Amino acid sequence: MQFSSYRDLREKLLAREMSCEAVVTAYLQRIEATRDRNIYISVFYDEALRQARSLDRKLDAGETPGKLFGMPMAIKDNISIEGTGLTCASKILSNYTAVYDATVIRRLKEEDAVFLGKVNMDEFAMGSSNENSSFGPVPNPYDSTKVPGGSSGGSAAAVAGDLALVALGSDTGGSVRQPAGFCNVVGLKPTYGRISRYGVVAFGSSFDQIGILSKNADDAAAVLGVIAGNDGSDATSSHNQVPDYAAEMEGVSLRGLKIGIPKEYFPESLNSDVASVIQERLDLLRSLGAEMIPITLPESDYAIAAYYILTTAEASSNLARFDGARYGYRSEKSSDLTDMYVNSRTEGFGEEVKRRIMLGTYVLSAGYYDTYYKKAQQVRRVFLNRYREALANVDVIAGPTSPFPPFGIGDKMDDPLEMYLADVFTVPASIAGIPALSVPVGFDSSGLPVGMQLIGNFFEEGKLLGTARAVQNAGKV
């Protein structure tokens, strides 16, 4: 029992061709049969079936089904669901149970979505391969020796492997888009503030944004329409009205669409297979009426440096709360309070998390604040202005999601800088706070997925999703 889209599933459910319970049971059986893939951290067997039966009774009673009626979803394990574990794939939160629902979870429940479980991720969303997890790595659905990307690797692998129809992830610098590209699914990072962050464990608070992973743009739009919007519990959530994304998508046509092509996204170092697949799809889009406009984003080389200064600074502050005193893991080796703090954090955090905390503490220190943090904030403003200039003349910006295809498990773990470069094309949009997504466009010579990143203007997710649908459908002609 597999579905190409939520529309397909919804039609069958409402026509009573199948029950919610049968659909959820099929997904749970597939999840159980693939537990060795390490995709799910926890599976809500009883609760998911309870939800499904409740929805079947709702339909029997003639009640109006919600907008996401019966949608089987996976949730990244840094998003709070009351009464369930919230580990962030970290030992330091191994015994923590969430005490409230994130705003997005509450909104999804109100529209009848079904939660199958919590999925694996890089610890505290810090990573590009899903290898920085206390639960171990997740294999790529297309080659079990390769990574699925990160940090939302479990979310992407769940959708690609038909272990959820749609998944929620979080994107700080590419953590939805890069795994989407590696796993051949759509991955959307909306405009910063479009979706409430209340109930999401913070990594970089001025970057973090909940994202959506799905098989197609229409499903992402359906979920976005439900979870987007202002939230009084999140001061950074936008007051901009939530539009009808489906209607906005219908207004997008390839004919006359202006696509900006930044030369900086096609360096000589770009993997040749990735370059070939992306160029082939761009040529196809041109043949269907799209206009390719060369643009330049000259500050792109500074993106990784600025991003890792700013996000680690925020992380060093955000993660100070995990100290073993109030909740989570507590070391038993401590002789006094100071020892307890030090040992709990030393034993509870993984190596990459500790590396970023130390880097963030360093750049915020009195002697280096102006040299690093303040300078990086100035660079961030330059990025914002540069994207505004570029997007004033084009509808979207296109390029590769990642500079290389999925790499082998363990290949980059000993070289953090090489790992960070996996996000070299996704980080700039995060710095600027603008929406971006990855859409599948083909495979390399080894049969591994290649994703195309599309970047749009503030709050133009509808145009972005409409373009993604056109790009994806163009490959089916």
From Swiss-Prot:
Catalysed reactions, as listed in the record: L-glutamyl-tRNA(Gln) + L-glutamine + ATP + H2O = L-glutaminyl-tRNA(Gln) + L-glutamate + ADP + phosphate + H(+)
- The source's superkingdom equals Bacteria
Q: Which InterPro entries match?
A: Amidase, Amidase_CS, Amidase_dom, AS_sf, GatA
How this chain assembles, per its entry, is: Heterotrimer of A, B and C subunits.
This protein is called Glutamyl-tRNA(Gln) amidotransferase subunit A
Disulfide bond sites? none
Q: What family name appears in the similarity comment?
A: Belongs to the amidase family. GatA subfamily.
What keywords appear on the UniProt entry? ATP-binding, Ligase, Nucleotide-binding, Protein biosynthesis
The record ties this protein, via NCBIfam families, to: gatA
Keyword Zinc listed: no
- Name the active site residues: 76, 151, 175
What the entry lists under Gene3D superfamilies is as follows: Amidase signature (AS) domain
GO BP field: translation
Name a GO molecular-function annotation: ATP binding
